[in-house]
Amino acid sequence: MSRGSSAGFDRHITIFSPEGRVYQVEYAFKAINSTNLTAVAVKGADAAVIAVQKRVPDSLIVADTVTSVYQISQSVGCCAIGMIPDAKFQIKRAQGEAASWKYKNGYDMPCELLAKKMADLNQYYTQNAEMRSLGCALLFISYDDEKGPEVYRVDPAGYYRGMKGVSVGVKQLPATSFLEKKIKKKSELTSTEAIELAIEALQTSLGIDVRSKDLEVVVVTKDNSKFTKLTSDQVEHHLNQIANRD
């Protein structure tokens, strides 16, 4: 067996290869793309936004039951991209952590602490032989009275970080490149600008004109810190604004 081969080192999650890699964790990152979806999150001056593809894989499925966005608490929302059972498990765990915190402390769990907690759990899954890494990535958004809008990404390796703009999923690279160019030009975005930047980044990365029924857009703002999902008509309005601007 050559030292550059993964054979023998990708069978156990707790074993490093000679190159210092943990292959099972790398495979978990690849599993994020298994649903062929992409999500984009943007932090503005007074709002945080997530825009994510919505794909109904079967004509017999009720479209309203298909979603990638979830309410964790009144003020914290989350988008989970990757293997659906793993994503559902992560969401339930996050909701449980947030509910437990509020029961003990009397107020909603801060978004950063929740992201850190979920990252710690993910990291724990990378070093136990009887477990496997979870094949999904999480995007959290919230509006904090002191910190303002917040966006956090949590990955299968157990790493989390606050972001100005971020994308996860199969078209992550082109979406991230688009965000970097736009945010470099203007970093202080209004809530409307943040929403339209997230939608435009998603649309550009996909290379197609998306319809309102193909998108889910959720937002928290200074004026309304509750996690809110935009209606189809509201999404259509923003799509028209983007089209007219172009």
UniProtKB/Swiss-Prot annotation:
Gene3D superfamilies: Glutamine Phosphoribosylpyrophosphate, subunit 1, domain 1. This is Proteasome subunit alpha type-6. It holds the Pfam family Proteasome_A_N. Belongs to the peptidase T1A family. The lineage of its organism: Eukaryota, Metazoa, Ecdysozoa, Nematoda, Chromadorea. Keywords: Cytoplasm, Nucleus, Proteasome. It is found in: Cytoplasm; Nucleus. The 26S proteasome consists of a 20S proteasome core and two 19S regulatory subunits. The 20S proteasome core is composed of 28 subunits that are arranged in four stacked rings, resulting in a barrel-shaped structure. The two end rings are each formed by seven alpha subunits, and the two central rings are each formed by seven beta subunits. The catalytic chamber with the active sites is on the inside of the barrel. Coiled coil: none annotated. CDD domains: proteasome_alpha_type_6.
